[in-house]
Amino acid sequence: MGVEKTIITQGSGPSPQVGQKVTMEYTGWLQKEDGTKGDQFDTSVGRGDFVVNIGVGQVIKGWDEGVTQMKLGEKATLHISPDYGYGPRGFPGAIPPNSTLIFDVELKKIG
């Protein structure tokens, strides 16, 4: 599957290019068997925006691919398969091995 993006709110700006700094707000959940959101494992809401250089391996592959498909101001849901997430290792204490992940992401700033 890789990453599947569903737009919640259309953006009107450009899409980030590989290596550009992006500022985002996000919440992540484990996907349940029925494909819906399960347990929340992380959020930037209330903690401050998340800033990263996108497309260069600083985050999971699903984010590198999904966020570069977004436009500035866009809010989207990313469904990320295990091979584009944390894979067979998972993330100890938060994400079990081979978990499909769901992220709601807002692309707030590029550069």
Curated annotation (Swiss-Prot):
Its EC number is 5.2.1.8. The keyword Isomerase applies. Inhibited by both FK506 and rapamycin. It comes from the Eukaryota. Keywords: Cytoplasm, Isomerase, Rotamase. Disulfide bonds: none annotated. Residues 19-111 form the PPIase FKBP-type domain. GO terms for cellular component: cytoplasm. It holds the Pfam family FKBP_C. InterPro entries: FKBP-type_PPIase, PPIase_dom_sf, PPIase_FKBP_dom. This is FK506-binding protein 1. It comes from Gibberella zeae (strain ATCC MYA-4620 / CBS 123657 / FGSC 9075 / NRRL 31084 / PH-1) (Wheat head blight fungus). The lineage of its organism: Eukaryota, Fungi, Dikarya, Ascomycota, Pezizomycotina.
